[in-house]
Amino acid sequence: MELRVERVEKNYERRLAVRYHDETAGRIYVVYGGCIFSMRTVGRDMSITMFGYRLRSPVMCALVSTELLQNRRGRGEAAAEPSVGGAGSPGADYLFTHHLGSASGEAPEDLVNTFDVNVRGLVLSKLFVGFPVPDGIVLRLGEVDEGTGVLRILAKPRAVNSVTGFVYHLDSASLDLTQAELYEVPQFLAKDIEDLLRMGELRRSPLRLSIPRTPVIVTGNRGLSTITVPSSRGRGGDRRRRRRNVTKMAGHVQIKMFRDERDGQQTETDAGRAEEEARHISGWSGGDHCRVEPCEVSHLRVWKVVSLIEVALAVRKGPLSWLGLAHKNPTDNLRAVLKGEARDVCEKLGPWTEIMGKSVLRPGPEMIYATVNYLLELGGLQSKFCIMEDLCNKYAAKHNIDVPNEAPPSDEMALIEELAVSILQKAAVVCEVLRFAAKAESENIAAVRNVVAPKQYGAASELLVHETSFLLNSARGGAFLGPEDDGRAATTRPLFKRAMARTDKKVSAILACIYLESRPSRIVGTILGGEDLVRALEEARLRIVDPWDKDDISAALRVLDSIVNFRLA
């Protein structure tokens, strides 16, 4: 995992505080014990996102928890509630590498701004490298590239003898790269939290223009687990947040997966295994895995994923799962999150509803979600397609599925294109209706306010009112303006909340009509009363011919992106 930042330094309480700032995202990053803590510098959201390796071995977790508890008792402190950032005694599900450092006797000051964690103890070292190491080992979990301004958590952490420098083979099953959502300030940040946030206001030298601004990137061939750390607040705390056990990926990052070719110090065994795996995984293209290729390869990518996504996202349970004893596959949590997102987005009324009922392909929510994510990737928008593609490649390799690498079957590809065209055409019509409604509010509000929608769409429209309000607010802000609007500003006419709610309800019925009808242009034009609108809607629909043409589908993609973001919020 890596992200581009700018180093910020400040003397604080007789020590040098080093933080990393992403001005574009409005976030400050702190490195602590091999983990990266991310905080917002603007807005009211005070939640903290942490990226790092979580301990997976039950024996290891028990040993670390015991050491943390003994350390606290030795200092005369009471046992603490779960605390990811502090030196307390967290639950076994919330132990990270910085807890490992605390258990080995490291002070918080020694863990700040370092990706190296000392592991002391024969049993712990054996759990990591397979045999006891009397000298102790150092886990090298990441690095800071000062030349390019990149913080990087290594896809393959290294275990190094703390005396001789000998590099051991690290058991990859002992650690799990995880995103944790925290709702309490970690103890090591609590002392300088105000000063930390002020660091975002410091005057910095301009960022080098040659360095492209990129989101957080996850590298390697394993997924990113997500958890929510329960609050330690007692009665009166936020129970809703304590109940959450599935966390979505952070909204300020985009996850992309590709093989990490920077880790050149891996052992010969690791290199051989990686080469063997690369030969088996079809369609793997190294660091360019998430780059959109020419048309034929693009067709092949989406065909592979749509063909395999349902089985690839199936969470497999062991024979003893009914007893609660089965060991979960490390990627099962990722599969569950993606499967849940597919259902949250695509099982509801949307641009895909009609095609799901009539297509020969019989697409399920997973197929629809994969297709939508691929379209979003084509448009350069935030997408989960690369994660899905990685899971499908692994599934094909594991089950010896022969996937062609040249051209997909033409009949199957035609069905996928039909699916993509249908979704985009519906989204294009929705875009025109939203633009029409936003414009009417500022010029001729009766054009929307006085329409009478057919009663058969009433029940369906009730489910879309809040989503329609979100889409209309985006349209009022100019999100869906096209080139023909000639730079027209967003709606400036003051609108009362009750009046806007009436418009939202009317438009939600129109959107339900678009989603349910095969040829909605004529019906919607009749409802809104205008042949010019019928013509505009039909032109927008028929403009979508090639679903892989980024220029033709740009307006429809903005609508799809807004729908997905609302339903996953």
From Swiss-Prot:
Keywords: Host cytoplasm, Host nucleus, Virion, Virion tegument. Its main location: virion. It comes from the Viruses. The keyword Membrane does not apply. The keyword Repeat does not apply. GO terms for cellular component: host cell cytoplasm; host cell nucleus; viral tegument. It is found in: Virion tegument; Host cytoplasm; Host nucleus. Disulfide bonds: none annotated. Residues 261-280 are annotated as: Disordered. Belongs to the alphaherpesvirinae HHV-1 UL21 protein family. May facilitate the viral transport through neural circuits. This is Tegument protein UL21. It comes from Psittacid herpesvirus 1 (isolate Amazon parrot/-/97-0001/1997) (PsHV-1).
